């Protein structure tokens, strides 16, 4: 670990100023340029001061969205995402997003308007907004910091920022009386020192152990996740795969990392195509870089063969979290790949996976022929829809997906690299995608952000249509509307239970989106989609597609979960 360079806080000047103003200036001087929130009486002054100081305040229509906006911004930029929410009911509204943010590993600073430290906040009686904000946010997984006095407020901010910068969600609690108190303007900039992880290689002993296993393998499979992308390991891993004759697969979060490689099988697990599954089953060793091997990557333990497993991760606790690794390599993905390249002997030309037949099989694969399309007169198979959208949407895009049964579309929509793809399933819930997409769109306005969301998650966050138009965000919203809670529908159906309560009327959302200022269309057939193709290729303003999809199409993980449940 090495010390990162100090951040410096607000410019100094003479006189006094309220704490909220000093903190706003400190935050801007740290290089933070955006904050997301929904004003409350205990945060309105701070939000206004932030905006005045040059930290653009983006107002959301719900606290849950404000927090997920900050997380989406942080995920995309690698910089601290700031959310500002009030206490009591505002925190209750935002708790869903707070738990989610704490599980993503993104650097998020949640500034919380806390009750006054003494007396009755309203001066009249019981505080109707009373809630244990510190206790609630700690239980949500956040590290909490409180400004207990006007004099300690700047140090509390410095500590919170330092912890967030390390890849954590933290909360800074600012009691109203502390915010309003006047203090001397600082004579010195605020110093924020934080530890920055220095990429480290694996130990010699672990490299030797991995080399011994790989040398014996004739059909190795290399699996890479988002961690490999963030480590910049793509080229080193591809060179290693060429040396040892390995096929390449990724997790869903690492999708398209090896796009263009002749031995790339795409995603492994619940989002695999048939060739990937068939080829992966033939592997006699699996080498994993920067992936947790969760239940979607392993299809509940069925997608990877029972062969020696070598797992590489920069964080020791991530190894063997889901599957037991035979060899653990604790180190940076790129450095470890380079170590293995140097340690492994040159292999003969006999590489069973690297032959002309394999290359032809992979290059000739047509995803549209990998399933029986289930289009009807008034609905589309979501997979067919996604294959068409792949050709119509701008290539240089960010893709954000909410959660739900419609996630079967993930393998059919590509991105330039894994950093342009954002899943929001870290809390296994729906309703988080819209906020994350707003944050991504703000972070990267030069690209079109495509949000794919189900009707259930959309209805939870529909008010943010106004935010998209107000902030002029470059977005295309693809509503996968099966008129149902699709995951629950198939959960019930797979257990031979009645599904009526999971199904809803067919509502046309396009006119609603038009009322907010979107270009909108209802899509029931491919002909409907082709009519809007010119606008999709070069969007000029936000676009909303209410895509009516066939609710009978189940995502693969629905049946996988049912089978897993049956075995246990």
Region spans (language model):
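Active-site diphosphate/adenylate-binding microenvironment
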Residues: 20-24, 28-31, 38-41, 45-51, ...
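Glycine-rich phosphate/diphosphate-binding loops that line cofactor/substrate pockets in enzymes
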Residues: 22-33, 72-78, 161-166, 206-220, ...
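A short, small-residue-rich loop immediately preceding and capping a beta-strand
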Residues: 33-36, 56-58, 76-113, 223-226, ...
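Glycine-rich, anion-gripping cofactor-binding loops and their flanking helix/strand elements
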Residues: 75, 93, 226-310, 416-447, ...
